[in-house]
Structure formats: C-alpha cells, structure tokens
Swiss-Prot record:
Name by which UniProt lists this protein: Small ribosomal subunit protein uS3
Alphabetized UniProt keyword annotations: Ribonucleoprotein, Ribosomal protein, RNA-binding, rRNA-binding
A biological-process GO annotation: translation
Organism: Syntrophotalea carbinolica (strain DSM 2380 / NBRC 103641 / GraBd1) (Pelobacter carbinolicus)
Keyword Lyase recorded: no
SMART domains: KH
Keyword Nucleus attached: no
This protein's encoding gene: rpsC
Pfam families: KH_2, Ribosomal_S3_C
Residue ranges occupied by any KH type-2 domain in the UniProt entry: 38-106
Gene Ontology molecular function: mRNA binding; rRNA binding; structural constituent of ribosome
PANTHER family: 30S/40S RIBOSOMAL PROTEIN S3 (PTHR11760), SMALL RIBOSOMAL SUBUNIT PROTEIN US3C (PTHR11760:SF19)
Amino acid sequence: MGQKVHPIGFRLGVVKTWSSRWYAEGEYSQLLHEDIKLRNYLKKRLYHAGVAKIELERAASKAKINVYAARPGIIIGKKGAEVEALKKDLARLTDKEVFINIQEVRKPEIDAQLVAENVATQLERRVAFRRAMKKSVSMALKFGAQGIKITCSGRLGGAEMSRTEWYREGRVPLHTLRADIDYGFAEAKTTYGIIGVKVLIFKGEVLSQD
C-alpha cells in the first residue's frame, strides 16, 4: 500500500523552501533544539493570533523570526508594546539579539495549518466531525483553493474503536512536484483521546519562468 510522504518535505528545493535557514558547523544540534524551543514557545504564546507559519534565519549571534499570522494586531499590541515584550522574552530565552517580523495571512481559509487548527478547535467543542470537515472544505473552495483534502483520525464521535475518515473536493495531486500543496496538522484533545487532523490544500501549479 502506498504511504503518504510529507507534501512539503517532498517539494523542498522545487516549489517549497525551508522554514529554518542557517548554517552551523559544530553547534548544529544545539541550534536545532533552540529552533524547536522557539517554535513551541511562539505557537503556545501566540495561539490566539492564529499563527500559520514561523520562519527562522540566523547570522552570527542574531536571529530573525518571520511570523505569519491571521490576526497580527494581537501580536503587535498597542503601539507595538506586545511585540517589544515578546522580543525581550525571546532574547532572554536564546541569549541572542532577536528581530521579529510579523506578516499577515490574507486568506486564512486557504492556509492548511489554520484550517487544521480550526477543525481541531471545533472537535474540542464537540461539533460533529463531518460537519466541521465539510464546512472547512466549502470555505476553502469558496476562497479560491483548487482542491482540499481533510483527514480526521482517532475516536471519532467518541466511538469505541478509532478510525480514519476523510473528505476531499477538487484536485489534490500528491505526486506532481510543481503542484503548490499546502499541508497542515493539528491535534484535538477531546475527552475520548486525541484526534489528529491533517489538511492538504492545492493552490495551483507553479510553472517555471523560463
């Protein structure tokens, strides 16, 4: 049976780029763990801002963080007070000078990570999983996605046995490297256990300029 490779990892260097961009000789593992720590901290702290993606760049003892969020106003705060406090906390956490750049996600309805988190939140609020999936699918297509597939896996509806249910509309080519596929994953922590939500959104093909 064919297994599903990670859609973004599969397209790295073709139509996708890395989310951490830096070079290290001896302290590679140390910096990698620092990256993971930073991502986890930012995801937790800025959860209500709807963080879609975090990109990290490093040069010498400086770190530049690009945060893509659906609600950037929450991160920035009044007159930039929140972002300044965040900058200080991150500098304390890493012992490095940190620069933060906040970017707005214009269409959160077709951002796979935000769609996955939205479905997971609905499942935690005990919304029927089929309704949550169908609503997100119709919204994504309405906002210009060419195809979307949502998979929910776990004890759906509190069933005794865990199972996987998926819903797809439009085209979602898994093997076409030039296909711009966005991938998102989230977990819904329900009283019955964890339900995993995977979202694949096809936004069209990236054609080379030559």
